[in-house]
UniProtKB/Swiss-Prot annotation:
Belongs to the phosphatidylserine decarboxylase family. PSD-B subfamily. Prokaryotic type I sub-subfamily. Keywords: Cell membrane, Decarboxylase, Lipid biosynthesis, Lipid metabolism, Lyase, Membrane, Phospholipid biosynthesis, Phospholipid metabolism, Pyruvate, Zymogen. Residues 303-322 have a biased composition (Basic and acidic residues). Binds 1 pyruvoyl group covalently per subunit. PANTHER family: PHOSPHATIDYLSERINE DECARBOXYLASE, PHOSPHATIDYLSERINE DECARBOXYLASE PROENZYME, MITOCHONDRIAL. It comes from Salmonella agona (strain SL483). Is synthesized initially as an inactive proenzyme. Formation of the active enzyme involves a self-maturation process in which the active site pyruvoyl group is generated from an internal serine residue via an autocatalytic post-translational modification. Two non-identical subunits are generated from the proenzyme in this reaction, and the pyruvate is formed at the N-terminus of the alpha chain, which is derived from the carboxyl end of the proenzyme. InterPro entries: PS_Dcarbxylase, PSD-B, PSD_type1_pro. One of its GO terms (biological process) is phosphatidylethanolamine biosynthetic process. Heterodimer of a large membrane-associated beta subunit and a small pyruvoyl-containing alpha subunit. It is a peripheral membrane protein. The record marks G253, S254 as: Cleavage (non-hydrolytic). The gene is psd. This is Phosphatidylserine decarboxylase proenzyme. Its main location: membrane.
Length: 322
């Protein structure tokens, strides 16, 4: 009965307005009130502040500053084996496994379409049919920056407007096509392991989704798909990120979905649904043995991310011809 009521609220509540309100409140500097809210949040969700670079909650000017707090360098050691891909986020694995032609497992008995997840981009979907996927859920207590599983060069980014359903076990079991319906940012990379998509999925009260190369992607929420492309290879203006390097962040919420091409990686055998993830720990191994080439990293922000690209509502914002 309680679960039915919670699900009904997902369809009844004004999720967009709640999200805007949460984003507005989380960005405000309110002195002692901000500290009080942070302290209550830390206590309720049992947040481990000893891992943060700034463990004192009084050092955060806004709730957003606290929520995207950077961790100490020593708390997430990076597996440097070039044949191993690492976990992109702290959280829990919701589902993982093989993409069955174009079906991705959402929850037991529930699948959704690869092409729908990729906003109907069948050319991108073709890269991942019969490939491998991992869905990682970030709870409120988790570190909310997202990192690279391996070295990668950005080729394409797509912002897809959508619903803002909460993302949790209950909604995954009961809201059809949840991840293909919610707002999301799709990032396609060329890697030593073939093409890789890293998808940042929004949810209720996820105030914003940001990337290190373009700053805030959403808001604004204008209801249109936006697309940016970059040419192949390394060149002036390309975005090359190293394994373990930050690529984006959530200001509240949510979920990261990784897609890998068929025959390129094998997931670590011990991983399963509900496995706890920590950035830098092994996620998958290459099906080939090689020594990874070095790539120059993009500069990383520490606090605020400055936008480098126009976020005007264009369907196709190309950096260069492809």
């Amino acid at each position: 009965m309680l679960n039915s009521f919670k699900l009904s609220l997902q369809y009844i509540l004004p999720k967009l307005w709640l999200t805007r309100l949460a984003g507005w409140g989380a960005s405000k500097r309110a002195g002692w009130l901000t500290k009080l809210v942070i302290d209550l949040f830390v206590k309720y969700y049992k947040v481990d502040m000893t891992e943060a670079q700034k463990p004192d909650t009084a050092s955060y000017r806004t709730f957003n500053d606290f929520f995207v707090r950077p961790l100490r360098d020593d708390v997430r050691p990076l597996n440097t084996d070039p044949n191993i891909l690492v976990m992109p986020a702290d959280g829990v694995i919701s589902q993982l496994g093989r993409i069955e032609e174009e079906k991705i497992l959402q929850a037991k008995g529930h699948n959704y379409s690869l092409e729908a997840l990729l906003a109907g981009n069948y050319l991108m979907a073709d890269k991942f049919r019969n490939g491998t996927f991992v869905t990682t859920y970030l709870s409120p207590r988790d570190y909310h920056r997202v990192h690279m599983p391996c070295n990668g060069i950005l080729r394409e980014m797509i912002y897809v407007p959508g619903d803002l359903f909460s993302v949790n076990h209950l909604t995954a079991q009961n809201v059809p096509n949840l991840f293909a319906r919610n707002e999301r940012v799709i990032c396609l990379f060329d890697t030593e392991f073939g093409p890789m998509a890293q998808i940042l999925v929004g949810a209720t009260i996820v105030g914003s989704i940001e990337t290190v190369w373009a700053g805030t992607i959403t808001p604004p929420r204008e209801g249109i798909i936006k697309r940016w492309t970059w040419p192949e290879g390394e060149h002036e203006g390309s975005v090359a990120l190293l394994k373990g390097q930050e690529m984006g962040r959530f200001k509240l919420g949510s979920t990261v979905i990784n897609l890998f091409a068929p025959g390129k990686v094998n997931l670590i055998a011990s991983l399963a649904s509900l496995s706890v993830t920590k950035i830098g720990q092994p996620l998958a191994t290459s099906t080939e043995t090689f020594v990874a080439p070095e790539v120059e990293p993009a500069p990383l922000p520490t606090e605020e991310i400055k936008a480098e690209h126009d976020a005007s509502p264009l369907v196709d914002n190309k950096k260069d011809d492809t």
